[in-house]
Amino acid sequence: MQLMLRLNPKTFIKVGREYVLKFGHLQRVWIFNRLLIMSGDAELNEQLLSSQEHLVKHPVYKVLGQWLGNGLLLSDGKVWHQRRKIITPTFHFSILEQFVEVFDQQSNICVQRLAQKANGNTFDVYRSICAAALDIIAETAMGTKIYAQANESTPYAEAVNECTALLSWRFMSVYLQVELLFTLTHPHLKWRQTQLIRTMQEFTIKVIEKRRQALEDQQSKLMDTADEDVGSKRRMALLDVLLMSTVDGRPLTNDEIREEVDTFMFEGHDTTTSALSFCLHELSRHPEVQAKMLEEIVQVLGTDRSRPVSIRDLGELKYMECVIKESLRMYPPVPIVGRKLQTDFKYTHSVHGDGVIPAGSEIIIGIFGVHRQPETFPNPDEFIPERHENGSRVAPFKMIPFSAGPRNCIGQKFAQLEMKMMLAKIVREYELLPMGQRVECIVNIVLRSETGFQLGMRKRKHN
């Protein structure tokens, strides 16, 4: 209980490190009648995350239930299996190739908007990146522009931002995670949360209905004509895949589709924003890494800003891959993942021997801590992209920024391509300067920084 009283978003990392030094990478904690296992142990993590049996997420995620319903993040059992199977083809190379066009266009807008900030003064880069990530995920998930980067941000984009912040705050408080206690102690915030969720869900449903109608019109036109413009020129979106899918012989309902689209909107903007903001901050503090990265960008993409960047171009940015890997190692966007055991978990261990963790137990895997273990990563608190060069492979389950196993992040390829595009465009255009305060990590649903993501930017002389 003492541990839980000491834990909050700001102290989580510090207290976690103290406990690891004192008790090792495996700890058992009782909170009243709840058994919690805190694991930074690669052997145990591998067995749990690889398991096809222990797939139920930790109950803390239920905070997101009112918004995301039974979407891929929160569902389990048959529903999760069916939805995962439907959504996996969305990340096939040919569809990702189309998504890269969106990354290209929206990152150009981001670069243009950053020009106002690139005056050598300190600013927090988070909002600019967040707006771009929202525009990207809306256009790729829903096939709809929401103009989050435009001056007049849409009510939908604002609702996503405000609701994410509110849910993140609730996530780190044991009593606020209980919907009834939250409602009783903060009725005004419960009302606000409901309003925000209604705004988002009404918008999503409207888009789904419009897209469903367009798809039906398109199919009837295709039967009458072989007009090229009807089909092949239209970019696929996740929504199209969902609209054309069936479960047990029936199409998905609007509500089922909405749950998946909302899940992608939440997971696809917040995590990427965190990853990119931390990466830009580290680049601003490491001019030698930035210079090496710029050299590669110019070599692969050239200096013609009007030339579209393709998925193949992004594949050639090998040093940038090392930079992204190192940033994800130090700052995994999802710093902790958890499971609630529905059945006994039998494990084997080279040090602790074989054993059983009983059904009903909760297991928390601290990805942030796993990535900072000096026995795997010497000088773990230093930003050294070169440690990932020359195909040097880290043992599986010792580097898991996208989690691992059957419930790993389905959009990891998407996220990496988006990060590459944004970083390439920003670093080619602007020098990142080491200004303002350093980041101070806060552990939440998504990793954040207490001090924001402060840096300076200066337009490069055209190279």
From Swiss-Prot:
E.C. numbers: 1.14.-.-
Highest taxon of the lineage: Eukaryota
Segments traversing the membrane: none
Gene3D superfamilies: Cytochrome P450
GO MF, one annotated term: iron ion binding
Cofactor(s) the record lists: heme
One Pfam family in the UniProt entry: p450
Main location: endoplasmic reticulum
Binding-site positions, heme: E267, C409
Keywords, ordered alphabetically: Endoplasmic reticulum, Heme, Iron, Membrane, Metal-binding, Microsome, Monooxygenase, Oxidoreductase
Keyword set includes Iron-sulfur: no
Membrane-protein topology: Peripheral membrane protein
A cellular component term, taken from the record's GO annotations: endoplasmic reticulum membrane
Compartment(s): Endoplasmic reticulum membrane; Microsome membrane
Family classification: Belongs to the cytochrome P450 family.
Biological role stated in the UniProt entry: May be involved in the metabolism of insect hormones and in the breakdown of synthetic insecticides.
Stated name of the protein: Cytochrome P450 4d8
Species assigned in the record: Drosophila melanogaster (Fruit fly)
Gene from which this protein is expressed: Cyp4d8
